[in-house]
Regions:
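Sec-dependent signal peptide recognition
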Residues: 2-8
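Hydrophobic h-region of N-terminal signal peptides that target proteins for export
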Residues: 10-18
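Disulfide-stabilized, aromatic/cysteine-rich ligand-recognition loop
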Residues: 21-38, 133-140, 147-152, 163, ...
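A short glycine-rich, aromatic-capped structural motif
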Residues: 41-43, 47-157, 163, 256
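Extracellular/periplasmic catalytic domains that process cell-envelope and extracellular macromolecules
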Residues: 95-98, 105-115, 119, 145-146, ...
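Acidic glycine-/aspartate-rich tracts in secreted/extracellular proteins
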Residues: 124-126, 264-266, 333-335
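Functional-site microenvironments in short loops/helix caps that host divalent-cation chemistry
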Residues: 152-295, 299-300
Length: 342
């Protein structure tokens, strides 16, 4: 009897802690949504759609507030940038992209920024300097948030070009995916891609991996042996906290802070960059906040990852975790693209 009472007491305490954490997360998300609306000037309809996605998720946010300990504060980030006279606003980029804090995607070898056909968020969502990236977001939710804001999820080659400083023609080996299951298709395509680009490996900030250049000197929670919501804090930095973590095209935090969802097409009809409503499979790009001390996997710009927790981008059960966020792309001159098909 005493044991039963003790178990019930423990369960009640755990439930109360979870309820309080849920309440804090919702409050943090409401504050974040207000900040997004104020900075970006999205329409009420756009914000209603994003609000429904964020508040309806139950997990999406800037980390589990019960355990997350961010590596730096928003105030310290803001003060540091002000002291260095750094302002991330770029009027030329805004004219080209039609939005704040986006960078044109192009190949400087034969194009200029004004000829870009797409743009990418300069920071991880919410795409606001000195704000923490949103994590615990499924790939399907990320795609829907981007669509609600008149943007879209980036294709893998767009992210790679933004990082490496030149968006080249897509080189997906769709022929290697024909007739294959998703996992096998990804394995064959990535092997060919990584072999083709591995000799020219580079990072967003230069040709060699460099500690201290990006937001990657953080620490995992002591209880984080796997990836559970209650064990792993999203101990990220504010975005833009490291001005040196900048690609040649003016995009920040592609290495470190939070890894990012991207769309990996397995055939030409799954390319978001060409206007397709049917997306491909999930791919994780970049790296996250512990890479100065523990490099969990390669993170050079054009490296393509294994099919970790893989599935269709629009699968309602697509993967989410404590160090995985996203950023959006935008096809220039279209005012957005149709919503992706589930």
């Amino acid at each position: 009897m005493k044991l039963r009472l003790l178990v019930m007491l423990v369960l009640m305490i755990g439930a109360n802690v979870a309820t309080r954490a849920d309440g804090v997360l919702a409050a943090q998300n409401r504050e974040l949504l207000e900040h997004i609306a104020a900075v970006h000037g999205y329409t009420p309809q756009q914000m209603d759609e994003v609000r429904a996605l964020v508040l309806g998720s139950g997990y999406m946010g800037q980390g589990n507030p019960a355990i997350t300990v961010h590596a730096d504060t928003r105030a310290a980030c803001t003060a540091r940038l002000a002291n260095a006279a750094i302002d991330y606003r770029n009027a030329d980029f805004e004219n080209i992209c039609g939005a704040k804090y986006m960078a044109p995607l192009y190949d400087p070898a034969h194009e200029n920024a004004a000829q870009a056909r797409a743009c990418i968020d300069q920071f991880e969502f919410p795409n606001i300097p000195c704000e923490y990236p949103v994590v615990w977001v499924k790939a399907s939710e990320a795609a829907q948030v981007c669509t609600a804001l008149g943007k879209r999820l980036c294709d893998a080659h767009e992210w790679e070009g933004a990082c490496d400083g030149a968006v080249q023609a897509p080189d997906y080996r769709f022929d290697l995916a024909e007739g294959m299951a998703m996992g096998a298709a990804v394995a064959r395509m990535r092997a060919a891609h990584n072999q083709a680009h591995g000799r020219q490996a580079s990072w967003s900030y230069g040709p060699q991996f460099k500690r201290g250049a990006c937001a990657q000197d953080g620490r995992k929670s002591a209880s984080c042996a796997g990836g559970g919501y209650t064990q792993c804090g999203s101990n990220t930095y504010p975005t833009g906290d490291f001005p040196t973590c900048r690609s040649p095209l003016g995009v920040y935090d592609l290495n470190g802070n939070a890894a990012e969802h991207m769309n990996l097409p397995l055939n030409a009809e799954q390319m978001a960059s060409t206007g397709s409503r049917v997306l491909g499979v999930t791919e994780m790009k970049g790296s996250w906040f512990i890479f100065d001390t523990y490099r969990a996997h390669p993170d050079w710009c054009r490296w393509r990852a294994p099919f970790w927790h893989g599935g269709r981008v629009m699968d309602a059960h697509s993967h989410a975790n404590y160090h995985l966020g996203f950023r959006c792309c935008k096809t220039v001159g279209t005012g957005g693209l149709p919503a992706p098909s589930p």
